[in-house]
Amino acid sequence: MKSDKPFLERYFYDPTLLQKGLIFALYPFSLIYQGIATLKRKTAKKHDFKIPIISIGNLIAGGSGKTPFILEIAPRYQEVAVVSRGYQRDSKGLVVVSVKGNILVSQKTAGDEAYLLALNLKQASVIVSEKRELGVLKALELGAKIVFLDDGFRFNFNQFNLLLKPKVPPYYPFCLPSGLYRESIKSYEEAHLVVTEDKDYQRITSISRPTKRMLLVTAIANPSRLDAFLPKEVVKKLYFKDHAPFNLELLEKEFYQNNATSLLVTSKDLVKLQDCNLPLSVLNLKLEICPKVLEEIDHYILSYPYNTKERL
């Protein structure tokens, strides 16, 4: 836990001279990683599930807004399922998190992002599975006619690949471990649609229950990206590893040491604080997506013969 910018975020986005030396020393391993990742995707068995599958993905590791994007576009359709890996969940294998808004498992079983999707998508079913093809098959079994695949670019499915491109890219366009990319940046050319923040969509933020002295507590990737949306009432920032659980005793200690009047958390973090008795302020995030992006997704869905405008 640190209150300043985490080491890895500095390493990937604003490296020191020493870190730059380490980056180039590790570059041969990045080339190996890139080759394996590309070869694995290109040679994977092709799956065609005969329904529209929209993959919301990115090329960089960590957060880039995939969950907010799904939360914004999935409610536009009926008979929908969302399939995700369920990062940092306590469970293994395939788990049905919700069926048309009826939540069946706990946040720890689902993972924070999948649980957030289940809480907000009342018309959709949410499924987590390390093997995405099994998740899609379960979605079909539950009656889904449209599937949104969270972080699915690397899978060789017959799908519409939408890639989110960050407004502020990593410092070097290298693959892990010298950079933050999971595949070559040339892979953007293989997507059906690439969307960039402030060009194709805007982030709209608001704070529920704001107070005079808020202590920011978050466990998301690249947490300093929140800085642009934070009010002056934030007295301190506590950053935890992406998806990490919160120690409530530690939060309470920090809360009183900083004379805070509430904890400021994101919606993703909020689902892990159901047992927290401290006052909570919530940083809400919505996306305003360019109509042309939505039209392209509609066009893809309508290309399947049994989908009609009534389903949109």
Curated annotation (Swiss-Prot):
Enzyme superclass (EC): transferase
Gene Ontology CC annotations of this record: plasma membrane
Residue ranges of coiled coil: none
InterPro entries: LpxK
Pfam families listed in its UniProt record: LpxK
Keywords: ATP-binding, Kinase, Lipid A biosynthesis, Lipid biosynthesis, Lipid metabolism, Nucleotide-binding, Transferase
Name listed for the protein in its UniProt record: Tetraacyldisaccharide 4'-kinase
Substrates-to-products reaction catalysed: a lipid A disaccharide + ATP = a lipid IVA + ADP + H(+)
Intrachain S-S bonds: none
Residues where ATP binds: 60-67
Record EC number: 2.7.1.130
Pathways per UniProt: Glycolipid biosynthesis; lipid IV(A) biosynthesis; lipid IV(A) from (3R)-3-hydroxytetradecanoyl-[acyl-carrier-protein] and UDP-N-acetyl-alpha-D-glucosamine: step 6/6
Species name: Helicobacter pylori (strain ATCC 700392 / 26695)
GO molecular function: ATP binding; tetraacyldisaccharide 4'-kinase activity
Domain of life of the organism encoding this protein: Bacteria
One GO term (biological process): lipid A biosynthetic process
Family assignment from sequence similarity: Belongs to the LpxK family.
Stated role: Transfers the gamma-phosphate of ATP to the 4'-position of a tetraacyldisaccharide 1-phosphate intermediate (termed DS-1-P) to form tetraacyldisaccharide 1,4'-bis-phosphate (lipid IVA).
